[in-house]
From Swiss-Prot:
Changing R15C: In HHC3; there is a rightward shift in Ca(2+)concentration-response curves with the mutant compared to wild-type, indicating a decrease in the sensitivity of cells expressing CASR to extracellular calcium. This is AP-2 complex subunit sigma. It comes from the Eukaryota. Keywords: Cell membrane, Coated pit, Disease variant, Endocytosis, Membrane, Phosphoprotein, Protein transport, Transport. One of its GO terms (biological process) is regulation of endocytosis. It comes from Homo sapiens (Human). The modification Phosphoserine is found at S140.
Length: 142
């Protein structure tokens, strides 16, 4: 099960935080800082999986952004690594070559993409076509 999803830049600024487990605000801030500290110092030669507390962080770096998913230790690493890649591809298609500013200024759309792809801490949809179709339909309602 997914505990939380974070998108952070190299400076540690959080661009998206989606929580599927209840944490108080101080704990959330501490987790954000710890995840950034763990992920940013890792060499590109290392795996994209990190043991973290009683969980596991699965992350992928795209340009200057780190896409991180915290999951249970027994979950499938590769499934979540592929889910991150799928998520980035959907964002790239939806925003026509996504960049960090798209995430900042269109954060509500990014949360919509997350909600279309993940539900209650599980991967909900893996078809990029279906997700994009749903997003375009929602956009037409605006």
């Amino acid at each position: 099960m997914i505990r939380f999803i974070l998108i952070q830049n190299r400076a540690g600024k959080t661009r998206l935080a989606k929580w599927y487990m209840q944490f108080d605000d101080d704990e959330k801030q501490k987790l954000i800082e710890e995840v950034h500290a763990v992920v940013t110092v890792r060499d590109a030669k290392h795996t994209n999986f990190v043991e973290f507390r009683n969980f596991k962080i699965i992350y992928r770096r795209y340009a200057g952004l780190y896409f991180c998913i915290c999951v249970d230790v027994n979950d499938n690493n590769l499934a979540y690594l592929e889910a991150i890649h799928n998520f980035v591809e959907v964002l790239n298609e939806y925003f026509h070559n996504v960049c960090e500013l798209d995430l900042v200024f269109n954060f509500y759309k990014v949360y919509t993409v997350v909600d279309e792809m993940f539900l209650a801490g599980e991967i909900r949809e893996t078809s990029q076509t279906k997700v994009l179709k749903q997003l375009l339909m929602l956009q037409s309602l605006e």
